[in-house]
């Protein structure tokens, strides 16, 4: 099944889910959305899909104008803010998981690198609004030189299907949570879905530990982990070597072979990689290309923070933050389906005489997905609008500029740029 049809199936499944009272029952707070009130559970759910980064006044006005079939009532922003607190974030997590399950069960063929599927794991700090709720849930921190200044942040972590441009699993935690613990959660999901066979998982610096590497070996995960330059494995490595992680009878562990590679970079520095991939078809020179496939997960965070403005939360509670986090993961996956399908058509129709290669404009697709999904959910649009979006995406293309490379600049830390009292006007 092609990606456009999978996108249609996901949206239809979401619509079926949120209109089924039996399925919604576990996701509402007890004794709420029971009586007939102005705001129904369905109306609040669709509002959360519909709302933009503008103020709530703008969103409430626009949803009544644009989604007439929803019969959205004239309520205050305080009433809506209160109502959303009675929807468990597990609902939106479930809808996001639905998008993952349908994609991997319905996709006809997946992309490969040297016969392997590629996944990348990475975490990123998320700026959160300051409130009692976020302080209690995510933790409260102070800063130097003013210890009285209190703030909070979160840690987002994802495992990303690099070649198929899909977020397989995502989670949000306290800022000081362990990235390795979050990564282990991702690996267990990969095991539960049966997707770890014939797959390579790429980790950045900071993820390697002997326990982490042993877990990958013992559970059948092929992995590539970048090492810090200061550890013994890196210091002893010269080219391509096989070492052994010694087991101990006290801990009940056995010896584990580990391949360590020294990779020269274009700027003259070296990076060190640890792997349990001993396939002779994957040579040392290919590992530099393989590790570079981790870069798209960085671009995915850029998409989430820039295109989706993920850190511009409309609510200031832990419940609101988790709701919006999983909605963004879901919409990002829907946009990637259209983007990749359109890219394939663009490549097929490209002429050999073209000066540049082109790709579908992701920003355009994200904007349209954000606009049409709530309209499909409330019955204003038919699913066929997704096919029209695909057609438009093939036409709305951007140049691919090859060979671009920029030196990494060490930026000075900036203050918090996201403020709830400074919302966009539209």
Regions found by a protein language model. Name each.
Residues 1-60, 74, 79, 84-87, ...:
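Single, function-defining residue in the core of a domain
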Residues 137-143:
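Short Pro/Gly-enriched beta-strand edge/turn motifs at strand-loop
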């Amino acid at each position: 099944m092609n990606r456009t049809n999978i996108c249609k199936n996901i949206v239809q499944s979401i619509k079926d889910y949120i209109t089924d009272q039996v399925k919604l029952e576990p996701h509402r707070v007890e004794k709420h959305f029971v009586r007939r009130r102005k705001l129904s559970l369905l109306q609040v759910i669709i509002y959360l899909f519909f709302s933009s980064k503008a103020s709530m006044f703008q969103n409430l006005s626009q949803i009544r104008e644009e989604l007439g079939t929803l019969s959205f009532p004239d309520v205050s922003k305080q009433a809506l803010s209160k109502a959303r607190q009675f929807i468990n974030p597990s609902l939106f997590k479930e809808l996001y998981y639905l998008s993952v399950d349908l994609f991997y069960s319905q996709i006809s063929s997946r992309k490969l690198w040297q016969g392997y599927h590629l996944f990348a794991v990475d975490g990123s700090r998320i700026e959160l609004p300051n409130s009692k709720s976020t302080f209690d849930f995510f933790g409260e921190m102070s800063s130097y030189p003013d210890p009285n200044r209190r703030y909070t942040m979160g840690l987002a972590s994802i495992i990303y299907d690099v070649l198929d441009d899909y977020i397989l699993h995502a989670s949000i935690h306290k800022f000081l949570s362990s990235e390795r613990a979050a990564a282990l959660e991702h690996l267990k999901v990969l095991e539960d879905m049966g997707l770890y066979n014939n797959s390579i998982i790429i980790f950045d610096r900071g993820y390697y530990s002997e326990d982490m590497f042993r877990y990958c070996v013992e559970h059948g995960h092929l992995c590539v982990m970048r090492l810090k330059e200061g550890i013994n494995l890196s210091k002893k490595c010269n080219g391509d070597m096989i070492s052994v992680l010694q087991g101990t009878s006290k801990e009940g562990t056995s010896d584990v072979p580990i391949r360590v590679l020294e990779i020269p970079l274009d700027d003259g520095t070296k990076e060190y990689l640890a792997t349990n991939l001993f396939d002779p078809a994957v040579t040392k020179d290919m590992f530099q290309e393989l590790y570079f496939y981790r870069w798209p997960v960085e671009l995915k965070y850029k998409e989430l923070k820039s295109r989706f403005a993920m850190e511009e939360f409309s609510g200031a509670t832990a419940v609101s933050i988790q709701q919006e986090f999983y909605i963004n993961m879901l919409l990002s996956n829907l946009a990637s389906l259209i983007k990749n399908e359109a890219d394939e058509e663009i490549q097929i129709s490209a002429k050999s005489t073209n000066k540049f290669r082109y790709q579908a404009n992701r920003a355009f697709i994200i904007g349209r997905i954000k606009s049409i999904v709530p309209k499909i959910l409330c019955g204003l649009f038919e699913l066929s609008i997704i096919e029209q979006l695909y057609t438009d995406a093939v036409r709305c293309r951007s140049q691919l500029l090859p060979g671009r490379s920029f030196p990494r600049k060490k930026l000075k830390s900036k203050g918090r740029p996201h403020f709830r009292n400074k919302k966009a006007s539209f």
